[in-house]
Design a protein with these regions (language model features):
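Juxtamembrane intracellular "pre-TM" segments in multi-pass secondary transporters
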Residues: 2-12, 194-226
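Residue-level signature of mid-helix packing/kink "hotspots" within the transmembrane helices
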Residues: 33, 61-69, 153-154, 267-275, ...
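Extracytoplasmic gate region of multi-pass secondary transporters
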Residues: 35-36, 221-267, 271
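Conserved MFS/SLC helix-loop-helix module at the cytosolic interface between two early adjacent transmembrane helices
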Residues: 66-102
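Helix-to-loop junctions at the C-terminal end of transmembrane segments
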Residues: 67-79, 274-286, 372-373
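Cytoplasmic membrane-interface "Motif A"-like loop-to-helix N-cap segments
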Residues: 77-87, 283-295
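Cytoplasmic helix-loop-helix junction between adjacent transmembrane helices
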Residues: 110-148
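Helix-loop-helix hairpin linking two adjacent transmembrane segments in secondary transporters
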Residues: 145-193
Length: 405
């Protein structure tokens, strides 16, 4: 386990900066999950419907999805650290204001501001990690970065509900903003080491081959394939995570307690798979093979769950296997994107492909919700499995394109 997360062999300044970047990513996921556990309390306070309150998430995702790529260009132009600090400061301020003021429309507006802050994380994070990680440790650093985000999602419900019980939902929002400001202070205390790309930015020289890229480069087939990969993994992951419990109940009459354990198994093993995938991607350079294999296993297992009413222990084991297989692919996914990114263009490229998360997360509730409304719970598993297999085709197509070039 020490090998998975150790950065001791890297320069200490770079190590501390990477730790700060991962902490910021943890906060980004923490912030994204804030509304869910506090939804009932906020709705009662504002006296609005669930649909009206859901507008906050819609505004957040639209702003984040539309502006993430332009912010990626900004990362490559002025530097990733300053953009990350600005994004975290903006997010923290938005949630503090949302908790301080008693207006529903201010609350909605602050989710738009938070969406703007959210655009900084992936472009800036991946740029900093790519520039300040040793190549032989990069896949493990990517894995730990992803794991940090999962950790933020995991601790959000319990800490937010604890703060709500003492200070109300507004106090919970302000407390979360304070957490973000603490991480911000850590980032401010860690200056970015002067790597070659920083020297070029400071001297005003050409910003390396990728710094001047535009939209024409981003719509190249190799980049669009990665956008599709991010979109499809978000589509299958968000849908299955959200609808697994109700689909199992409707299809097989699975008790809610067992279905919840199955979901917990999927999520926990997904996180473990990410860490294992970081080590694997560092040892095996065929990242496309790792991604394709993991998605094939996940798709096959998901289809199996949709076909058969399995004993509880086997169901829990298979959902865990599916989660582990998908998690195994994430570090390789990031390495595949990095492989097609010119030096100096990490912000723009990672910002662009990361919009796939917003696209997939927006489509998933519609498709999976329609399947449940049409009383087709089996379709939840078959659709998720099919998307996983289509995702495999994007990996293999991208690999064939790179070989042809």
């Amino acid at each position: 386990m020490t090998q998975l997360i150790s950065v001791r062999t890297m320069p200490s300044a770079g190590s501390r900066l990477i730790a700060g970047v991962c902490a910021a990513h943890m906060m980004s996921h923490y912030y994204m999950l804030m509304l869910a556990p506090l939804l009932a309390f906020i709705r009662a306070d504002f006296d609005v419907s669930y649909t009206q309150l859901a507008l906050a998430l819609t505004v957040f995702n639209v702003v984040s999805g539309v502006l993430q790529t332009p912010v990626g260009f900004l990362v490559d132009r002025i530097g990733a650290r300053v953009v990350l600090i600005g994004g975290l400061a903006l997010s923290s301020a938005a949630y503090a204001i949302a908790g301080l003021f008693g207006s529903y429309w201010i609350f909605i507006a602050m989710y738009g501001v938070a969406g703007l802050g959210n655009t900084a994380y992936h472009p800036a994070d991946y740029s900093l990690l790519s520039h300040h990680s040793r190549p032989d440790r990069l896949s493990q650093i990517f894995a730990f970065h992803t794991f940090a985000g999962m950790l933020g999602s995991a601790i959000a419900p319990v800490t937010l509900l604890a703060m709500q019980s003492f200070f109300g939902w507004r106090g919970a929002y302000i407390g979360a903003a304070i957490f973000g400001l603490i991480v911000l202070a850590v980032l401010l205390a860690q200056p970015e080491p002067i790597a070659e790309h920083r020297r070029e930015l400071r001297s005003g020289k050409s910003r390396a081959p990728g710094a001047a890229i535009g939209w024409r480069f981003l719509v190249a087939p190799t980049i669009l394939i990665n956008l599709a990969f991010f979109t499809l993994t978000a589509l299958t992951g968000n849908g299955l995570n959200t609808y697994l419990i109700v689909a199992l109940g409707a299809l097989y009459g699975t008790p809610a307690a067992i279905a919840n354990i199955a979901l917990t198994s999927l999520l926990a093993m997904n996180a473990i798979g990410v860490l294992a995938g970081g080590v694997l991607a560092g040892r095996i350079r065929q990242h496309a093979l790792i991604a394709a294999s993991g998605l094939t296993v996940a798709g096959a297992v998901t289809a199996l769950i949709g076909l058969f009413d399995l004993p509880s222990a086997l169901l829990i084991g298979l959902t865990g296997l599916s989660g582990f297989a998908v998690g195994l692919t994430y570090p390789s996914r990031d390495m595949l994107v990095r492989a097609v990114t010119p030096p100096g263009a990490f912000g723009a490229v990672f910002g662009f492909v990361s919009t796939g998360f917003n696209i997939g997360a927006s489509i998933a509730p519609i498709v999976y919700g329609m399947l449940m409304d049409q009383r087709q719970p089996r379709g939840i598993f078959f659709f998720s499995a099919a998307v996983s297999l289509v995702c495999v085709s994007t990996v293999t197509f991208g690999l064939s394109r790179r070989r042809a070039e």
